[in-house]
Amino acid sequence: MAVSSCSILGGCPRIFPSFECRSDPDFTGHFQSEKQKTRGFSGQIHGFSGQSLILRFPPNFVRQLSIKARRNCSNIGVAQVVAASWSNGPIASEEKAIGVVAPVIDSSCNNNNTEVVQSEFTDSNDSFLSSDGSLAVHAGERIGRGIVTDAITTPVVNTSAYLFKTTAQLIDFKEGRFASFEYGRYGNPTTKVLEEKISALEEAESTVLMASGMCACTVMLMALVPAGGHIVTTTDCYRRTRIFIQTILPKMGITATILDPADMDGLKSALEKHKVSLYFTESPTNPFLRCVDIELVSKLCHSKGAVVCIDGTFATPVNQKALPLGADLVVHSATKYIAGHNDVIAGCISGSKKLVETVRALHHVLGGVLNPNAAYMIIRGMKTLHLRVQQHNLTAMRMARLLEAHPKITRVYYPGLPSHPEHHIASRQMTGFGGVVSFEVAGDLNTTAKFVDALKIPYIAPSFGGCESIIDQPAIMSYWDLSPVERAQYGIKDNLVRFSLGIEDFEDLRMDVLQALDSI
């Protein structure tokens, strides 16, 4: 309990319970929303009623409350409920604020008679944030005017397990009456903030984070496709995903139809011929940046009861929102644009609560948990997501046009160009075309390698979506173990280059590319 030395009403001292105090030093807001009322406490302090009016906080009261919450509520889930209750509530005049009645709650944080409500930490309302830029900065971290703790930045919670005050509290948690965490593999407060942030950007009900994009893809496929089931996917995709679909899923009796991204007749035929459980594709795809008509595919698949999952890694939630277009799930390698700094590996799946919880259940069994320190780094990276993506989009578009006009480049693959086979689709369902440009150099493997080696700014490396520009020859970086004939089956030519444009100044990149082309 916290006692204010300056709250006297009719000569009666007022006792402030920690649960009910708002982190609001100017005392301009309500203390508690109506839904967070408690019951079961009828005691009085030294004869004074627990329902007196609160007048004002001492100057250092907020800081003391923050410390007391962490000391008294050693269960982090409870502490977040407490912190959320301090911060929540609409702005009100001081006259209205003075009149708010604050019920007293046992400061030990384990009153078994307390009505438990879901923490707004796990069910935040970001409706006052109207743009992707604001959501990327604040979603998941803002609770009304405040935040989940008194810190501006979300803290990293490094723990493998979470305690319960009593057995009764544990039972309440198991039966859904008490919001908290149990074991590190099942959830973490820092990771939860990141999940809420991604959900807000994707307009999803729920998101689950995993240790990598491949982890997210494989767990999703195993969770949603039954043994003996059938999936439809596309020819152009990340090679490791294709390997899993073609070599691992058959061991579970799962078969696949592999189609060109634009082959809608083939999709209709597969839906008629098979009981398709899932349609899964990237859009744009890797490395040719093909774009699937998400709205049309979703209508066709839903008519036959199939789930649609779109890998939107190349697009980002800023450039494309697959769920409003009709997809059921969207998966990302958060390693790429979402984290955006080439320093963390992660994956995520967003969609309806029902489907995501099905995936989450298997994820809890298999593991592949994202470290909370990595989650924090992604949260930090996402605060500049919209700014980075704008720069990626602009630089890539300008580079694609430059390359398409250059005599030493035979073909450019970029959905923002009218020459791209799905430009009309990309223009309809994307607000930007991303930061990756693939192209073919006029020459063989060695000529192309000479061009790549002559570049001074981009790093020769795998991955994409970071601040630094990265370039590679897929024939060498991703398909070197296959013969040229086998590579050709996937459209991978020796002169193909995948260029991930970073956030460097375009003029520097332009001059670098031109001098490298001059060298061949």
Task: Name what the model sees in each region.
Residues A2, R14-T38, Q44-N113, V156, ...:
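Conserved N-terminal alpha-helix of the aminotransferase class I/II PLP-enzyme fold
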Residues A2-R14, S107-F128, G133, H138-V148, ...:
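Conserved PLP-enzyme active-site core in the AAT-like
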Residues R14-S52, R56, R145, K408-V497, ...:
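Conserved C-terminal alpha-helix-loop-beta "cap" of PLP-dependent enzymes
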Residues D126-S130, A136, G140-F181, K354-E357, ...:
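Mobile, glycine-enriched helix-loop/loop "lid" segments at the mouths of ligand-binding/catalytic clefts
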Residues L194, V359, T447-F451, L509-V513:
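Hydrophobic side chains in well-ordered alpha-helices
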Residues E203-A204, H230, D494, G502-L517:
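Well-ordered alpha/beta subsegment
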